[in-house]
């Protein structure tokens, strides 16, 4: 069989360094750091670099500066690095669950009532941000907090 197994996920120590610094900082000063990213609970296999231009996938190295670049974030590794530095970690939770717990539906309803001409736009944006078919499940939210602080909004 000539098929090669996919490479094991690579840990990237440089990626966790800023989180370790935040973790140490939250132990010295009462604060909370919110992380929101296209994330997973563990490292993805292979290269996850991708580009998005006008809401569509785009070749990452074509037309530099014209597209948004992203890569999957390993929230499992980041959470461990923050905990190892002494921070309290909340989440990750999906973006949809996070925004819902903050009351995004109530806000969307108020916006729609204030501007009936934009109801469709508001409904589409709400669905894109919160639905499992859109960014609601793809993006995750995690908070790093000082020990002793209450859970931040969205993580109660």
Annotate each language-model stretch with its function.
Residues 1-156:
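Long, Lys/Arg- and hydrophobic-enriched amphipathic alpha-helices
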């Amino acid at each position: 069989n000539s098929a090669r197994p996919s490479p094991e996920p690579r840990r990237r120590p440089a990626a966790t360094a800023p989180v370790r610094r935040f973790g140490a900082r939250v132990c010295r000063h009462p604060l909370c750091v919110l992380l929101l990213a296209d994330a997973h609970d563990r490292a993805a296999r292979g290269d996850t670099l991708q580009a998005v231009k006008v809401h569509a996938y785009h070749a990452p190295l074509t037309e530099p500066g014209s597209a948004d670049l992203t890569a999957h974030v390993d929230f499992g590794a980041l959470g461990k690095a923050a905990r190892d530095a002494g921070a309290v970690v909340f989440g990750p939770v999906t973006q949809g669950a996070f925004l819902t717990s903050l009351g995004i539906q109530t806000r969307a309803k108020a916006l729609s009532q204030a501007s009936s001409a934009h109801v469709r736009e508001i409904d589409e944006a709400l669905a894109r941000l919160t639905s499992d078919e859109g960014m609601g499940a793809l993006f995750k939210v995690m908070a790093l907090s000082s020990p002793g602080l209450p859970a931040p909004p969205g993580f109660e």
